[in-house]
């Protein structure tokens, strides 16, 4: 079974996120959408509500599960024994940012690969 992790703050959950989840769920046997929690920031929407909204939005995708994590993403990947990380990108500048994040993650944990998935151009701003 091939699985992946799609992390994000999802604050708020957008149609762009759901589009990426839908597309990813068609490519992988299991997708774990992980709400990343930054304990140093208070989000616009409480974490519990984000999880609830994601669960509702992901009902059409039986191979998608929702999780949350309040530590480093590399630690999550290691603990869950996941090997594929999905990141959505909307622009060339985001590709550069993701490359830098990927390099940092590789220093922390070499056991996973990051795949960049371009966003749907019609949903880039939503």
Predicted segments with their positions:
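Nucleotidyltransferase catalytic core that binds NTPs
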Residues: 1-126
């Amino acid at each position: 079974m091939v699985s992946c992790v799609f992390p994000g703050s999802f604050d708020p959950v957008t149609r762009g996120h759901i589009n990426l989840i839908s597309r990813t769920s068609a490519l992988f046997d299991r997708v774990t959408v992980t709400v990343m929690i930054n304990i140093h920031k208070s989000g616009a929407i409480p974490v519990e509500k984000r999880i609830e909204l994601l669960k509702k939005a992901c009902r059409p995708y039986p191979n998608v599960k929702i999780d949350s994590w309040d530590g480093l993403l590399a630690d999550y990947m290691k603990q869950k024994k996941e090997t594929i990380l999905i990141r959505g990108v909307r622009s060339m500048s985001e590709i550069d940012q993701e490359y830098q994040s990927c390099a940092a993650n590789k220093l922390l944990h070499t056991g996973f690969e990051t795949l960049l998935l371009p966003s749907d151009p019609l949903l880039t701003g939503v």
